[in-house]
Regions:
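Helix C-cap/helix->beta junction micro-motif
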Residues: 134, 194-195, 224
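Short beta-strand
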Residues: 44, 310-314
Length: 315
């Protein structure tokens, strides 16, 4: 958020605000270069990172164990996968670790290599970018504002035709914050399995939901092998620079393909060590959820009484 002095600089340097380049909102260096605003003065609202910042407990532990950088990480990430399994009640043998969820999204798309994919939109632009790199055609099913951006499951399924090979859903969705309940998601996954369609669910924001158990599709990975759930720690755990993500699928053949084509030691030693610390910090988990839930309710109530604004209940 620029100050008044910087706004005056826009006018002096004739910067056309209507012809700005496209870049990720967290790319502060590019924003600094284009708008001539020191990145230290920018308050970034686009990254959706936990306002509490990195866990103090994790900071202390990490500072005391920086020697982990002198060792190669476990190539199989055994301890980390066990920590992930305990964190989200998943079988560690069904878990693949990656250099952020972005690497896993890219790896999944390249290995599934769909000729056509169906996206639930509006949504994270990285999905369509990765699909374009392999020459896949994409169809976007748009959530409707008049329906408060909630999904009409039956209508969505009518678009899951036999020529679609991959369905991508961000749940809860970015940027609408709307979420699909687990029962509805199972209906989608079940019908997709009958039509030989693989489903990727990005749960980057699921820990922010009022009731995680009502939304997460991780339990469904035990029953459906045409499904992969992807998560990361960038948002909830305020660690976007760590680049730690994980995916969960019960498809042994697909897991084998992912491991064969993934670079070894994809996640470095610091990332693997810190990832375990983050997922085991239950105090931080509960403190964050308490803050987000109370602030969401407060801000929703305030915005509801302001002229010109309509907040949408995502859950």
């Amino acid at each position: 958020m620029p100050n008044t002095q910087n706004l005056e600089l826009y006018q002096e340097r004739n910067i056309d605000m209507d012809k700005k380049p496209e870049f990720h909102g967290s790319d502060l260096e590019k924003i600094e270069e284009y708008y001539h605003i020191p990145k230290e003065e920018i308050i970034c609202f686009s990254a959706n990172v936990n306002p509490l910042g990195l866990s103090k407990k994790v900071k202390k532990e990490l500072a005391s164990n920086l020697d982990v950088i002198t060792r190669y990480p476990d190539r199989n990430y055994t301890s980390l996968r066990e920590a992930i399994g305990n964190y989200c009640s998943a079988d560690p043998s069904h878990i693949v670790v990656g250099n952020g969820s972005t690497e896993l999204i890219s790896l999944l798309i390249s290995q599934r290599a769909p000729k056509k994919a169906l996206l639930l939109g509006p949504t994270y632009s990285e999905y369509s970018r990765e699909l374009s790199l392999i020459g896949a055609s994409t169809e976007t099913y748009h959530l409707q504002e008049e329906n408060d951006f909630h999904l009409n499951v039956d209508d969505f399924l009518s678009h899951c035709t036999e020529d679609v090979a991959l369905v991508i859903i961000c749940n809860p969705n970015n940027p609408t914050s709307s979420a699909i309940k687990k029962n509805d998601m199972e209906q989608i996954i079940c019908q997709c399995k009958k039509r030989n369609i693989f489903v990727m669910i990005d749960e980057t924001y699921v820990e922010f939901a009022p009731c995680i158990e009502e939304i997460t599709a991780i339990p469904l990975t035990k029953r459906y092998d045409n499904l992969m759930v992807i998560r990361g720690v960038s948002k909830f755990y305020a660690a976007p620079g760590l680049r730690f993500g994980y995916g969960i699928t019960s498809s042994e053949a697909f897991l084998k393909s992912l491991h064969q084509h993934q670079n070894p030691w994809s996640l470095n030693s610091v990332g693997a060590y810190t990832g375990e610390l983050l997922l085991k910090d239950t105090d931080y988990f509960h403190e964050t959820r308490a803050l987000i839930l109370s602030e969401r309710a407060r801000m929703f109530a305030r915005l509801s009484h302001m002229d010109g604004y309509k907040p949408y209940a995502g859950y």
